[in-house]
Regions:
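Nucleic-acid endonuclease domains
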Residues: 1-20, 24-116
Length: 116
C-alpha cells in the first residue's frame, strides 16, 4: 500500500506485516544493471532513520517505458558510506538551506539483487 505523499523515508507499507520500503525510479536505457548513483530525498530525515530497517527497492525504467528491472537492497547491506549528502541549496533558492543526498550504489553493487 502506498504511503501518503511526503511520508519521510518510506514509500510503501505492507498492510499485513507492516514492512516499510523505499522506492526509487530511474529512467535509463540500460536496465540490465543498476546505476552507480541515484538521487535520494531530504538528507536529515534519512540520516535520522539510517539505523531503522527501511529497505530500498530500485525500479529502473527505460525511456520508452517498454521494459523494466527491479533491484532490491536489504537494509542490513546498506552502509552509511553509500549515502552522500549533497550541498545545501543556496540562500537565494526557493527552499534555501534544504539538503538532499545521493545513493552511491557503486559501493554496494554486489549486494543489489535483481528480482525482475
Amino acid at each position: 500500500m502506498r504511503l501518503p505523499p511526503n511520508f519521510k523515508c518510506a514509500d510503501v507499507i505492507c498492510d499485513f506485516c507492516g514492512y516499510l520500503a523505499q522506492v526509487k525510479t530511474v529512467n535509463t536505457p540500460q536496465i540490465e544493471s543498476a546505476p552507480k548513483t541515484i538521487l535520494g530525498a531530504a538528507w536529515r530525515p534519512q540520516k535520522e532513520r539510517m539505523d531503522a530497517a527501511i529497505y530500498l527497492f530500485l525500479v529502473l525504467v527505460n525511456p520508452h517505458k517498454t521494459s523494466h528491472s527491479i533491484f532490491y537492497l536489504s537494509a542490513d547491506l546498506q552502509q552509511p558510506e553509500m549515502f552522500r549528502p549533497r550541498t545545501p541549496l543556496s540562500s537565494t533558492a526557493r527552499r534555501a538551506g534544504w539538503q538532499g543526498f545521493c545513493y552511491e550504489l557503486d559501493r554496494v553493487l554486489g549486494g543489489l539483487v535483481r528480482i525482475r
